[in-house]
Amino acid sequence: MRIPLFILTFLFTFFSLATTPVSADSGVLYTDAVTYCAEAKAVIVDEFDITYHRSNGSVTFSFSLASVEPNLNTSVNLYINAYGIQIINQTLELCDLLQGVICPLPQVNFTGYGTYPIPAEYLSKIPSIAYTVPNIEAYARVQLIRVENNEVAACLQATLANGKTAHQKGVIWASAIFTLVAFLVAIWHTASGTSTSPIQYRWFDILFIFQVAAASGLLHLNYPLVYTNFVQNFHWALGLFYSSSMQSSISKMREKTGGSMDSTAYSEVQYINRKLSPYNVYMDDNGILSSPESLAAFFKESALSKRSLEHFAKRATIPSVLAQNMTTDINTGLPVYTNTLRIPEANAYDTIWFVFLALIGIFIAFHVLLFGMVLLFDRMGRNRSHLGWAARLRRMWWPFCVGNSLRLCLIGFFPIWIFAFWQFHIGDSGLSIFWAVFGILLTLVPLATAFLLSLLRARRISSTSPEINSLYTSFRYFHSIGVLYRQYRQKFHYFWFTPFVLAMIARAGFIAFGPASAWAQVIGNLVVEFIVLVALLACRPHKDKKGDWLGAFLSICRLIAIGLLIAFIPDMNVKPIPRAVIAFVIIVFYGVPVVFLFVGFLWNIGYGYLWCKHSTRVEDGLEVERFSPTSSNSSVPPPMMKNVDAATFVSSDGAAASRGSLSMGGAGASGAGLAGGAAAAGTGLGRRSSLIEPVGDNVYEASASSADGALSPPPVTAYNPYGKEEIGYPYDPQDSRLAYEQAAMGRGGVNGPGSPTDEKQWSRRY
């Protein structure tokens, strides 16, 4: 189906205005970067700049060149292309221009500059969209051709810009600071020990959306220029930071360990001639200027006179520049992405690896300083309730450090796996390959270990709350590995690893190992994201509906953004303007989730402190607070928790039996019952016995509901929520409370004297 051109133009203009700030420099077109497009042989060009000012319809230009051959007569071919549309492609004789001053070319270095008005007939041909769209895909090429044999004597190419770009320092800093603050706030809430704020796991959603956006620019696709500039805003999320000294050290390291790949990074303008380039040519031969005569007339009107060339002066010889069209054969995607950041593709993984090592050093230093502060405030605040957080954090310090270490692995996981796989793909330095293997192990082993330990722990039955997953009752697990699974329901505690971590591995593999097939890269990532979305919709793993909705929404946005990348596959042959429109749509699908996450971040900052202060879910640590002495501000364990000597321990069943014997058989029977209970305790503890027993006044108050409890059901074979078979009475919270009250009041057990089967006797005793 063909989309009407006016609709594409409207969408193109709308999204460009929505993503580009208004500036005082609007209405200016200029050469952004200039380079040789062929080896300089007969003519050396040192400077070539052109700027068009829309406000006064004039052009200012400057150039510096020299001929190295005598009697060099050339013609000039001027070619201008914008969004694949050929605007100018004309060849003119230099002897017919500028009154023959440069025919033949002077064999001296000379410079020229000036400002000249452009006739109105040409101004009307320039579309207004050229001044509003960021990163316009336009370039000019100037070739000097020998008159005698039509060989190219010199070739220059220059990208054109209007001062608007999707690559903004403000976006880079804002996104990086947003992620950093979210991470620090997450650590702050975790350090409190009692916070239930979702920011403790939402921080990774913020980081991951930026990592996915940056990684989408690493594929072997024909990207629009605006999209390549957009994804470069998030190079920090992949750990790609440029440092000249670090790049020099990495290059030397690679050379000494078998590396042979080029260590030079090339600028973006040098990729103009590539097959997969935003400047490639597609369309139509209808130019703004229709004939050589009309173009010659323009030069004649604004020609330089001999008098105006008096300022040309001899200069020192300009050294020859090597041919730079060697970048023509470089693959698009990851190599171009890193080279644009001045990082050679061969140095890409080592750059990320050393940045990650620096992050580990910062992590260690941060925790050392924090521990010193905790010790200081703990000593200062033993009698001050507002400093109770220090005492809590000191007791949970090692689980806290383990949890933050797992977070650090998540930060580096996706970029390290992408570029480690890429290092395997290109080979080169043996030491770089070793670092790649080490990086994979350093990020995978801790997360895989945490995953296996959580699976084993989840199969254990808690003695205090057998109906609840042990991961959500264990203090050590909840405050360490819990930073990964606490956002999920007990049944889906593993969801952080399967499918999310495994999905990151699959994405990295398709990106790094698929540069030979753009279809494999895009479809592979699309299938992975689709599987994640289906898992989210089918399982609804989050502990609340808000989490399920947000998780599915983020996945849908990623799925649409990845799916739209199909338009950039070279085989699709999508024309430049539709590709640019699609690029703006993809930018929207990455921008909208960031807005939602930012609003949620503002809400979650005070969550657990200013509002929603109390835990209401097991997944929020409700059971951990009930059975942990660190759940309060006091450094003294509450009275209901008491360590009991196993040698003299009397279980609840034994105590209840003894009290029942006392009530039914008098003092003599009481002694026998007590002895029987002690003997039972000495023989061994029951399956549900615990060395932590409620003592003192911390017992349930008798209630009418418990007094009027129904008869206990017959024993059945049941399975607990974690797959273990149990024979006996199925657990029910109301029945447990009733049994507890019965034991506290001296009742004799389920079927013994004083049981619910003897209602009259129970009524008299109650």
From Swiss-Prot:
It comes from the Eukaryota. It is a multi-pass membrane protein. Residues 757-766 have a biased composition (Basic and acidic residues). Residues 704-766 are annotated as: Disordered. GO terms for cellular component: endoplasmic reticulum membrane. One of its GO terms (biological process) is fungal-type cell wall biogenesis. The keyword Nucleotide-binding does not apply. The chain crosses the membrane at residues 171-191, 206-226, 352-372, 408-428, 433-453, 494-514, 518-538, 549-569, 581-601. Glycans are attached at residues 56, 73, 89, 109, 325. SMART domains: TRP_N. It is found in: Endoplasmic reticulum membrane. Disruption phenotype: Results in cytosolic calcium elevation and increased nuclear content of calcineurin-dependent transcription factor crz1. Affects cell wall integrity and leads to abnormal distribution of chitin. Sensitizes the cells to the combination of osmotic and temperature shock, affects vacuolar fusion, and interruption of autophagy. Finally, results also in a significant loss of virulence in both the invertebrate and mammalian infection models. Its EC number is 7.-.-.-. Residues 1-24 form the signal peptide. It is an enzyme of class 7 (translocase). Keywords: Endoplasmic reticulum, Glycoprotein, Membrane, Signal, Translocase, Transmembrane, Transmembrane helix, Transport, Virulence. Residues 25-170, 227-351, 429-432, 515-517, 570-580 are lumenal. Residues 192-205, 373-407, 454-493, 539-548, 602-766 are cytoplasmic. Endoplasmic reticulum membrane flavin carrier protein that plays a crucial role in Ca(2+) signaling/homeostasis via the modulation of the calcineurin-Crz1 stress response pathway which is important for both stress responses and virulence. Belongs to the transient receptor potential (TRP) ion channel family. This is TRP-like ion channel protein flc1. It comes from Cryptococcus neoformans var. grubii serotype A (strain H99 / ATCC 208821 / CBS 10515 / FGSC 9487). The lineage of its organism: Eukaryota, Fungi, Dikarya, Basidiomycota, Agaricomycotina.
